[in-house]
Amino acid sequence: MIPLYDAHQHFHFDPLTPHRTVIDADLRRLGLKRAAVNATNEEEWPVVAALAREYDWILPSHGVHPWDSGNRSAGWLAGLRSQLIADPRAAVGEIGLDRWIVDGIKPRDPRIAGIRIAPLAEQAEVFTAQLALAAELNRAASIHCVQAWGAMLGLLKKTARPARGFLLHGYAGPAEMIRSFTGLGAYYSFNVQLAEPRHASRLENFRAIPADRLLLETDAPTKAPPAEHNRFPLGPGPDDTPINHPGNIIVAYEMLAELRGVTLEALSVQVENNFLRLFL
């Protein structure tokens, strides 16, 4: 059994709640050592903090996601600082930029019902404030970026960054930007959803990323692998998409080892070193 590390997931999200006991047992049986569980708004911070006290494999991470940037409170940044100071293990995230939520999502999509969508400029303000806080406290930052890679690179260049580095979770940016992001301190997490044929170009990126910057993630309960790769089916969620069991992290390890032409054991040693260097 190899040690497993999940660099980005959401164990606190509702679709996983009825399955927590089973998931916990499955993860312990698989050999999961740590998983970074990312809160996405102020209401979730105490929930993730409480779960981290209950489950010893959870590494808590707190932030305001770009989808939630338009709904933050007046004292959100002070609250985030307090949350991070209360737990020296805690990372910053999920934070970032998302142009699709501004320009691409359908107005009646239930995921945005009742929330205010922040324009990209406002998202950038919220992101840079959190990145600067991560730099001040030297906490890892877990970054979400959709259709805004040029803007993200520009912000990372001009904003203080944590000395330990930051994670571009589920990296989907251009291959030609990898060198620039790496020079700024980036790590990159491989997601099991990349097994889908439509993601072939993103798979190639993970051949080129330096070995000492590789991590793996599930993003559970979202981004389930294709059915033929889904080792732990949990059925459909409220939106009829498959619920992704965090145990599918082993599938990500197997896929990435094959993609890079290394043994599972060699990959696990490298990923463990990378995870501990970034997060702990």
Locate the predicted segments by residue:
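Helix-turn-helix-type domain boundary/helix-start signal
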Residues: 69-70, 265
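H/E-rich (His + Asp/Glu) clusters that bind or coordinate divalent metals
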Residues: 10-13, 17, 91, 96-100, ...
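Histidine- and acidic-residue-rich, metal-dependent catalytic cores
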Residues: 66
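Residue-level detector of alpha-helix boundaries and kinks
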Residues: 33, 115, 137, 166, ...
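An N-terminally biased module of ancient metal coordination in phosphate/nucleic-acid-related enzymes
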Residues: 1-59, 70-71, 75-80, 85-163, ...
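Short hydrophobic/aromatic-enriched beta-strand-loop microsegments
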Residues: 56-63, 164-167, 187-192
